[in-house]
Curated annotation (Swiss-Prot):
Keywords, alphabetical: Hydrolase, Metal-binding, Metalloprotease, Protease, Zinc
Family statement drawn from the similarity comment of this UniProt entry: Belongs to the UPF0758 family.
Bias kind Basic residues: ranges: 31-42
Residue span of region Disordered: 13-42
Protein name listed in UniProt: UPF0758 protein BamMC406_2419
GO molecular function terms attached to this record: metal ion binding; metallopeptidase activity
Record-annotated MPN domain positions: 136-258
Residues annotated to bind Zn(2+): H207, H209, D220
Length: 258
């Protein structure tokens, strides 16, 4: 008797026992599907900064990038907005804040405070350096703008001396003291000694009034007179004493007091 396998292709005439076993079903826990990351680029400040530049970010978003994470139960953007609001939404006021202000703000802490202090100091030095490069001593307006930028928003009184050569070129700028002129250790003899070391032919002195009022006090006028007379002994000239406020200045020279 002929085998039925002779009438059909061999592949169709296999013994069922020889057929390959069906793949076993996976009976364990389902494998989690990999989620494709969402495209957050239109939303996250870091990505927008890299793609569109820092001008695309708000002040609060720039601060949020510095903070990195939130604190005090807030997300990082709420922390950034709260910090900025503390300075009246003014980056300029934030730039001139005392270092301990950041550390005492809720949710900031020591590490974030250090970052903010470093960044604000870098920004302030860059602005002062840029203004100094463009400073024209023969232009009273430029000198006053420079001084306003340097000390106008300081929360304490700062005494600054500009040492000039015979052509009124800038030799050096020094902050001599801090506090208030009634308690600040401003010693005319030290300024005169420094002028001799630098071979300065002329000086401009300045200090700020944190109150914003620029009307000179009696102590301001007395110090100006003493320093003017002391510099005359070494053939150096006091060109001006500028009192600096947050938005205005007072010039002794312009007022005819020198």
């Amino acid at each position: 008797m002929l085998s039925p396998c002779l009438a059909v292709p061999a592949t169709e005439c296999r013994d069922p026992a020889d057929a390959p076993a069906a793949p076993a079903r996976h009976t364990g826990p389902a494998r989690p599907r990999k989620r494709r990351p969402r495209n957050w680029k239109p939303h996250l400040p870091r990505e927008r900064l890299l793609e569109r530049g820092p001008a695309a970010l708000t002040d609060a978003e720039l601060i949020a990038l510095l903070l990195g994470t939130g604190g005090g139960g807030r997300d990082v953007f709420a922390s950034a907005r709260a910090l900025l609001a503390r300075f009246g939404d003014s980056l300029r006021d934030m730039l001139d804040a005392e270092p301990d202000v950041f550390a005492t703000h809720p949710g900031i802490g020591t590490a974030r405070s250090a970052v903010l202090i470093a960044v604000t100091e870098i920004a302030r030095r860059a602005l002062v350096e840029k203004a100094r490069e463009r400073l024209q001593i023969d232009s009273p307006g430029a000198v006053e703008d420079y001084l306003r930028l340097r000390i106008g928003t300081r929360p304490h009184e700062v005494f600054v001396t500009l040492y000039l050569d015979a052509r009124h070129g800038l030799i050096d700028v020094e902050e001599s003291a801090r506090g208030s002129l009634t308690r600040m250790a401003v010693y005319p003899r030290e300024i005169v000694r420094r002028a001799l070391v630098l071979n300065a032919a002329a000086l401009i002195i300045a200090h700020n009034h944190p109150s914003g009022a620029v009307q000179p006090s009696a102590e301001d006028r007395r110090l100006t007179r003493v320093l003017h007379e002391a510099l005359a002994l070494i053939d150096a000239k006091l060109l001006d004493h500028v009192v600096v406020g947050t938005a205005d200045t007072f010039s002794f020279a312009r007022a005819g007091w020198l």
